[in-house]
Amino acid sequence: MMLTLAGAALLLLGASGPSPSTHVALSAEFVPPARAGASAHVAVTLSPRDADVRVNEEPAPRLKLEADEPVLVDKQAPATRSSSFDPQNARYLDPALPVHFPVAVKPTAPRGKQTVKARVTYFYCSKREGWCRKGTDDVEFAVDVR
């Protein structure tokens, strides 16, 4: 019994942040501005692992950079309040298209290739099984600061 409690304590202490979703796989990449004056963004692809699972358009997915992020600054508009969720009229994201989150490179960002960490929050549903859940996953991507 003591070994089981010690093992459980180690598992709890070792857990830092959310565990990845078993229903949706995420990947992220930094997309620099296409031309001078244009905006940079982080493109996040949310790929359901089960054909029945869909990622909701509303409430819209959100990207949150780490508080002490030295490379990027978030340029997203503030989150808006959504009306109550209606599963019968829900709209879903196309899994083939990434969601774009506007960002800018900080003028004080260190030069060279930098790894940026962020957290993505989204909502997804299974129509067949009749449930909806909130997903929160960590992503990492490279930014080449010139």
Task: Give residue spans per PLM region.
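Bacterial N-terminal signal peptides
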Residues: M2-G14
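Extracellular/lumen-exposed scaffold segments
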Residues: S16-R146
